[in-house]
Amino acid sequence: MLDEGRTLSLNVFLNALEEGYRNERRYCFILGAGASKTSGIPTGEELARQWYGDILERYSREEIKALKKRLGVRRTQPSSRAYFDLYALRFFPDYQNGSAFLERTLERAQPSLGYYPLASLLANTRNNLVITTNFDSLVEDALFIYTDKKPIVISHELLAQYINFNTSRPIIAKLHRGLFFDPLNRAEQVSGLSEQWKDILREAFRRYTPVVVG
């Protein structure tokens, strides 16, 4: 349950953001999977449920038990927390099939209405940074559709060094990589931040106040 003493009404939150911006504070936006749902992209929990059904159809109980032991899988009850374990089971042994599945799932998604104000903020204010674990291209698509600003998209940790926080151009930092850059989808890949991201994020949070969306 949310701590009511730490929960803000929408009006209080927006007023605080507006006043902070007038006082030269910069905000960045941290996007999770929930931000993509209204654009037709399944949540992590919805994908986990789909993969769980596929696994039950493909394997016997004994085979699932053996695979869990081989892959070090701990969670198989479908939930957002089991996303990475169920991905590992569903697409073993060829995880390129997992990448192809995600491409098919995400490629037709279009930015929902909520991406319009986000694109406007990124393009027209100093609040120009998005940090996300999502693979999709909804933020950059919204910028192309609604604004004339081309974003700097960091779709791989090896490109993180090219982020320039002094630019007025929108920056999209994809911590788990972009859809076409072998996205990180297994538990051992996301157990911690890569070294390339750590220094960049420290600097980002010195300059920006994070606002979490989805």
Where do the model's predicted regions map?
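Active-site loops and adjacent core secondary-structure elements that bind or stabilize anionic groups
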Residues: 214
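Conserved catalytic-core helix/loop/strand module for nucleotide-ribose chemistry
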Residues: 1-209
